[in-house]
Design a protein with these regions (language model features):
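Extracellular glycan-associated modules
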Residues: 1-171
Length: 171
């Protein structure tokens, strides 16, 4: 992702009936991760106008989450929503926080910038893969959502570039 915006933008939100923050990555100037409505402040920013490879992993067995920026672990904690299961059947939206399923968008929470190669897996990727992905534009394809799934649901003031505009991060 790349952004120089100063608003509390939302790269990713997944909402269900009854839980609008089932899975949310919010506020790229001081990231928050929300799972099942519970919030963890990451305290890492990515709104400096440069490309950043952002990856978040979470293991529900022990509640361990990891926040990677450009292939490096910036924050890791355990016991966050341990035993919780993210429910299927929701709506995933890139670039907006959903205050109700598929809507309730607030302009102040919209993502302003460029996103590329967004993928979602049902398992925790190995650190080695995350590091490799951060150094190339070949991110593989998520088994829940892959980047190409998003091009058909584009709405609003969104432009799709094909091929994508990914720039490798050189750490």
């Amino acid at each position: 992702m790349k952004s120089s915006a100063s608003n509390a933008g939302t790269p990713f939100s997944y909402a269900l009936q009854g839980e609008d923050n089932e899975l949310l990555l919010f506020n790229y100037k001081d990231f928050d991760l929300r799972i099942g409505g519970k919030k963890k402040t990451i305290g890492v920013s990515a709104n400096d106008g440069k490309w950043h490879a952002i990856c978040v992993t979470w293991d529900n067995k022990n509640g361990t989450y990891q926040f990677f920026k450009d292939g490096a672990i910036e924050k890791q904690e355990t016991d966050f929503m341990k035993g919780y299961t993210i429910k299927a059947g929701g709506t995933l939206v890139l670039g907006q926080d959903q205050d109700n399923v598929g809507g309730g968008f607030a302009k102040t929470q919209s993502f302003r910038g460029t996103m590329d190669n967004v993928n979602v897996w049902s398992y925790v990727l190995p650190k080695k893969a995350i590091i490799a992905f951060s150094k190339s534009c070949s991110f593989g394809m998520g088994n829940v959502y892959k980047w190409s799934d998003f091009k058909y649901g584009v709405k609003g003031k969104t432009a799709v570039e094909m091929p994508s505009s990914c720039s490798p991060i050189n750490n």
